[in-house]
Curated annotation (Swiss-Prot):
Belongs to the NrdR family. This is Transcriptional repressor NrdR. Negatively regulates transcription of bacterial ribonucleotide reductase nrd genes and operons by binding to NrdR-boxes. Residues 49-139 form the ATP-cone domain.
Amino acid sequence: MQCPTCQNTDSRVLESRSADTGKSVRRRRECLNCSFRFTTYERVETMPISVLKKDGSRELFNKDKLVTGISRACEKTTFSREAIIDFVDSIESQIIQDSNKDIKSSQIGELILKGLRKENEVAYIRYASVYRKFNGVKDFVSTLESLKGSSKNELASIL
């Protein structure tokens, strides 16, 4: 690993520990030339995921786009920034496990809706209104009724 101050490639590892909930390794290093201490992170390299858009184009999966969209849906709710990032991490893990390098944007949207429905109904409605392009009150009402119906079914199954 190259030292950030003197660019020497010889260093020794002082400490290693798991980071990012086991997805990476954090290492404290010391340069053998100038004794500067620095931190590095090692992560497993994953194959890039292509998102197949509705118009037929492809783009690389962008985790930040999910964080931004979900953050907007979760404004003024109990979702913290950390919870949103954890939520996006879980969606990314599902995508990596379920896909073979390509996934449709509609599948990503449905994964988000499924997760938001369980976590926060307000965020679910907000995200659904943009994702499903609600045109009016009828769209909101039908989505609210489906939420209400599933809540009744869940309650009935518990009782």
